[in-house]
Amino acid sequence: MRDKIRLVSSAGTGHFYTTDKNKKTMPEKMEIKKFDPTIRKHVIYKEAKIK
C-alpha cells in the first residue's frame, strides 16, 4: 500500500514537496536531498505526515 507523504525542508523555509512511498519496502522515515527554491540551494528534506 502506497501512502502519501510530505517532504519538508530542513532549512526552515516552510517549503515542501508531496510524494508517496511504499511502507512495506521502506518502513523507515525518508530523507532526501532536493532543491529548495526559497533559498535556491539543495537541502535535506525530511518526511512528515500530510495533515
Swiss-Prot record:
GO terms for biological process: translation. Keywords: Ribonucleoprotein, Ribosomal protein. InterPro entries: Ribosomal_bL33 (IPR001705), Ribosomal_bL33_CS (IPR018264), Ribosomal_bL33_sf (IPR038584), Ribosomal_zn-bd (IPR011332). SUPFAM superfamilies: Zn-binding ribosomal proteins (SSF57829). GO terms for cellular component: cytosolic large ribosomal subunit. The keyword Ribosomal protein applies. Transmembrane segments: none annotated. One of its GO terms (molecular function) is structural constituent of ribosome. Pfam families: Ribosomal_L33. Belongs to the bacterial ribosomal protein bL33 family. This is Large ribosomal subunit protein bL33.
